Amino acid sequence: MSDRVYLTRDGYNRLKDELHELLHVTRAEVLEKIAEARSHGDLSENAEYDAAREQQSQTEARIADLESKLSSATILDPKHIKTDKVYILTSVELLNLDDKKETLEYTLVSSEESDSDLGKISVRSPVGRALIGKAVGDKVTIIVPKGELHYEVKKIFVK
């Protein structure tokens, strides 16, 4: 059995919608491409057929992945998230201890919902792992390819 997946209601619904699209639209389109490529004759040197079969393989793998994640999902309600420490679905404001000016804000989410452009980082990322369990006032050292970054947890909240 796979690991438990923690999702927001929106994240769960997005994955469910993607699964529905794959099952009811993409799968049929791929089967049409395979049938079309087969109609061109010799399959041994048919790049179109090979590409369609590869797309089918990727589609079926994604379907299996989504079904697994959705079946092991726990939907988290932000209203029930504690803010005494950094947990999944909490947002955290960090002060850069090296320059005392820069502040960063991240929201910790599951890998399935991470989006760095929106400040949503995975609890499994190096930054997420460093922050989990920290409380306001705690110092955090985050190891990145360029070296170490030093922050202090200034605020923990739920959006």
Swiss-Prot record:
HAMAP family, A to Z: GreA_GreB
UniProt-listed NCBIfam families: greA, PRK00226.1-2, PRK00226.1-4
Name of the protein in question: Transcription elongation factor GreA
Coiled-coil residues: 44-75
MF annotations from Gene Ontology: DNA binding; RNA polymerase binding
Disulfide bonds: none
BP-aspect Gene Ontology terms: DNA-templated transcription elongation; regulation of DNA-templated transcription elongation
Family: Belongs to the GreA/GreB family.
Physiological role: Necessary for efficient RNA polymerase transcription elongation past template-encoded arresting sites. The arresting sites in DNA have the property of trapping a certain fraction of elongating RNA polymerases that pass through, resulting in locked ternary complexes. Cleavage of the nascent transcript by cleavage factors such as GreA or GreB allows the resumption of elongation from the new 3'terminus. GreA releases sequences of 2 to 3 nucleotides.
A UniProt-annotated Pfam family: GreA_GreB_N
Organism: Chlorobium phaeovibrioides (strain DSM 265 / 1930)
Record PANTHER family: TRANSCRIPTION ELONGATION FACTOR GREA
Keyword annotations: Coiled coil, DNA-binding, Transcription, Transcription regulation
InterPro entries, alphabetized: GreA/GreB_C_sf, TF_GreA/GreB_CS, Tscrpt_elong_fac_GreA, Tscrpt_elong_fac_GreA/B, Tscrpt_elong_fac_GreA/B_C, Tscrpt_elong_fac_GreA/B_fam, Tscrpt_elong_fac_GreA/B_N, Tscrpt_elong_fac_GreA/B_N_sf
